[in-house]
A protein has these predicted regions:
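Structural preference for beta-strand elements that scaffold enzyme active sites
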Residues: 1-3, 40-43, 69-73, 92-95, ...
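Conserved, mostly hydrophobic/aromatic
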Residues: 34, 75, 85, 160, ...
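Glycine-rich, proline-tolerant flexible connector loops at the mouths of alpha/beta enzymes
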Residues: 35-70, 162-174
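Alpha-helix-loop-beta-strand connector modules within alpha/beta enzyme cores
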Residues: 6, 52-90, 175-195
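Catalytic alpha/beta core domains of metabolic enzymes, predominantly
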Residues: 108, 115-264
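Active-site mouth loops of central-metabolism enzymes
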Residues: 3-29, 94-100, 127-135, 200-208
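Short, acidic/polar
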Residues: 22-34, 104-105, 143, 210-215
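Catalytic beta/alpha-barrel core
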Residues: 43-49, 70-78, 93-103, 124, ...
Length: 269
């Protein structure tokens, strides 16, 4: 499972405060903690006004790279910001994100065409918003993949995000997401499928239980990437266990290795 660590995001109040104060040590500690917990990428999202975003992301990326060798997921809703901010990374990472909205793809996919090491998250939304049914999301998916082919971007560099919605307000959200995930996986075996796991549990008590259950269901359907908190030991344990149960971990070697490294299970003194 590809783990995109979510803990350096300006929408989190403590992170927003650190950004405002330019508290580099706070950002660095979060980067180190996520790397030690088993993250694959470290997401970096400023969540500041767009006119401040490029400079803020530059500072955040410098903080992260000063203490971590992990690639960075450069995160912004603005394609113009992403087109500038990715250049601050000293090694290829992940652009988060594009969608079928406006001309975002035509601003970002040329960057990927020229920079072969970079990957991208593609959201299944368009100018109408988030489609309600699986068929409409898959139509957005087909358009994104047609553009990827046009720009020479292989499926293995794309992380499709089917857009997880709140369980308590979405009548058929789970069925829609599982259908989209399984269909995308069937059509493109080498593509990555990701999700912001915690979106599923907003406004529900004991959110962790919902998050864990959804992760198992989604992985069974074909999810192989997730935006989540890697320092959540229960979540990491469930991910390693599910990979083993799905036959993705020969002889449970990854599960055993992760346990020995202390990534899940009782905290070892």
């Amino acid at each position: 499972m590809i783990i995109i660590g979510e803990k350096i995001n300006g929408s989190i109040p403590a992170v927003a405060e650190a950004i405002a104060k330019r508290d580099a040590e706070f950002i660095k500690k979060r980067a180190i903690a996520q790397e030690e917990a088993g993250a694959t990428f470290i997401d970096c999202c400023a969540s500041v006004p767009e006119e401040q975003e490029v400079e803020t992301l530059k500072w955040m990326i410098e903080c992260i790279e000063s203490v971590s060798d992990l690639p960075i997921a450069v995160d912004s809703p603005s394609a113009d910001v992403l087109a500038q901010a990715y250049k601050f990374c000293s090694r290829p990472g992940l652009i988060n994100s594009v969608s079928g909205e406006g001309d975002k793809i035509d601003k970002i996919f040329p960057i990927l065409a020229e920079n072969k090491g970079w990957q991208v998250i593609a959201l299944l939304s368009d100018d109408t918003g988030i489609p309600k049914c699986a068929a409409d999301r898959l139509r957005v998916f087909d358009k994104i993949m047609a553009k990827a082919k046009e720009y020479g971007i292989s499926p293995s560099r794309i992380h499709i995000d089917p857009l997880v919605e709140m369980l308590c307000t979405s009548e058929n959200g789970i069925e829609t997401n599982i259908e989209v995930i399984s269909t995308v996986r069937e059509r493109y075996p080498s593509i990555h499928i990701t999700a912001a796991v915690s979106n599923i549990s907003f406004n529900l008590p004991v959110r962790k239980m919902i998050n864990l259950g959804f992760t198992v269901l989604a992985m069974n359907a074909g999810l192989d990437s997730a935006i989540l908190d890697p320092t959540n030991r229960d979540m990491m344990g469930v991910i390693f266990a599910t990979e083993a149960l799905l036959g993705l971990d020969d002889y449970c070697m990854e599960y055993i290795g992760a346990y020995r490294e202390g990534l899940f299970g009782p905290v070892k003194n």
